[in-house]
């Protein structure tokens, strides 16, 4: 098949479109969309998002390409192919937003992975346009992640003030990084390597912010069962370190084996063992952790391993670590009550929740 090339007008349009599509949705301005549409955009407060105003224009561009005989991506290569892929993914994603929303509601009700009744339609819409089956399945997982992230970041937090808009912006960047292109290419299945530290006064909603991150991780689609491999309802676990005495905290974190200490009459799974590989664990009130506990937590964050109390066999932790505190950690570090190396490992991204 001969290689097709976009003309100058189409390449300019799709390049500008891609720039908008990879923008944080909580930062898109009407001006950017207006410039692409060459007309002033009137904000519809009832519309799901400003992005939806682009749908008919993008569809029209693809119809023009189809009229020239290019109804799939297969003839295109290199940068042209990449530009068109992202535009096609944009259309397919928005076509299935209502079904994704219903699936979110169904899993909230059931607490388990629900059948993805529309999966064949999504995969077909992609493969018939030139995506391989493997790539189509990966993008179905990304569609699911995108919709959950928008749902929990948008509706899981209260308020529309500038500081809350900035918080939503920061949470989205935490899930998809500051460069969504890099995330799409390299990091979509590696975000557990990056810990997050959430700071804020008591009662400001640090837990809700952490939950928005924890429920928005990438979960692969399983074509054999036509379900996603885990439910986001079980993907977020939290433990408040201030609630446990020093004698129990290690058991709650790492678990223990039968006979490890007086009263250990059975094996016990700690939160690290219970956390899904597609999920996240919130260590709330991390400032209350003793230096001894910090050393053991550092091992988990650094080496991704932990050992239950009474065991000599290390276990692998595959989830993501989120820590939160109302305390001023820099003061604790200065006083020698919080380890510098542990602080740096936790703070790959620091998010500050505004006061009410």
Task: Identify the residue ranges that each predicted region occupies.
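N-terminal accessory segments that target, anchor, or regulate ATP-driven/P-loop NTPase machines
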Residues: 1-159
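Conserved catalytic/coupling elements of P-loop NTPase cores
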Residues: 194-356
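Long, hydrophobic, amphipathic alpha-helical segments used as structural scaffolds
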Residues: 100, 104-111, 182, 186, ...
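Short, flexible helix-adjacent loops and helix caps
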Residues: 108, 131, 180-187, 222, ...
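Solvent-exposed amphipathic alpha-helical surface segments
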Residues: 103, 178, 182, 216, ...
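Short, mixed-charge, low-aromatic patches
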Residues: 121-133, 143, 166-168, 302-303, ...
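Pre-Walker A (pre-P-loop) alpha-helix and adjacent loop at the N terminus of AAA/AAA+ ATPase modules
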Residues: 153-194
